[in-house]
């Protein structure tokens, strides 16, 4: 059987909403990632079979197949095809899994895959009139997050709960307290700050050159969202963000963010031929559907399905990255799967680092891969790692990798 390996994985810093990366177009962010991956591996770009990039919005500068735009902007040959994948929050991971399966099936030898999102630059949109020129008011939607142009039939059958309400639904169903959510959020920030200070992200984060108002340019090379000054007391004083007596707040939720991330995948045979040392083997992936109103539980059936496919158990997994859309959602997944919290998001998660939708799936896998590599010198190095995300409208996706080298 063909072996799929990951040779390199990188990401930009994750920018805050309206922060330093807000000045950079998403297609330029993605182009930087692709260009850097090729340069770091020193491969002939004509060897690349195809490029897959995830993106959740696609309503603004990321429209009309951003993967293709980024490929050309990266200076890569126009002969390389590219396609944009949309599974909302899991788009970046889906892109990687599609590429891995293509290699496994013998469709190609080398792929670039990942994801990008600029929530800061997401536009407002409103519908065209159905009959002639409109009079009166129009409803405009902020495309950075949530439903837009919801189908009335969809709403009547499944509801169109905002993402925060879906987290409230899980908090109620799994009896997750406000205190537990705030403690989890605090720990996410503290772990992320500790990882930044220790330089754990240095090998995965590439700097982004950002133009300034004075005409100069600066390099942005660090995640913007982690808060050094946060405390459980401060988090506990925040008001519920979605319902009056709720427990989900802005402090125990992920942010709206900007960023890009991608990996270089190839067959094991091609890696040997090019004298490239893989950092991990792609073991497998799985997706699953859940009720949209509890979309955050999606990683549970996706992970269970994947463990069955790979003949593994949660006891075999040494490190886990769960996208922290909300503390309530992540705690529900941990509880339902019976996971050891000590191996989950060891360097913080999206509550601290940020959640740049289409980028996040690739981002959590990139962080997982580099942490597994860093721990290779430990007395008991990790073997298997799991990356998983919940997905709006009720899905989950999971991927397992095996450390190499």
Name every feature range the model reports, one short phrase each.
Residues 11-12, 22-27, 31-32, 40, ...:
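N-terminal extracellular/periplasmic Venus flytrap/periplasmic-binding protein-like
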Residues 26-42, 66-70, 95-98, 163-170, ...:
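Short, well-ordered amphipathic alpha-helical segments that serve as non-catalytic structural scaffolds
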Residues 166-168, 201-204, 283-352:
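Active-site pocket-lining segment
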Residues 1-24, 36, 145, 150-152, ...:
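Condensing-enzyme catalytic core mediating Claisen C-C bond formation in acyl metabolism
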Residues 23-111, 115-135, 205-221, 293, ...:
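Conserved beta-ketoacyl condensing-enzyme motif
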Residues 110-169:
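Flexible glycine-/small-residue-enriched beta->alpha junction loops
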Residues 55-111, 142-147, 157-162, 229-255, ...:
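Conserved catalytic cysteine-centered active-site region
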Residues 86-117, 171-200, 262-269, 334, ...:
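Active-site-proximal alpha-helical scaffold in enzymes
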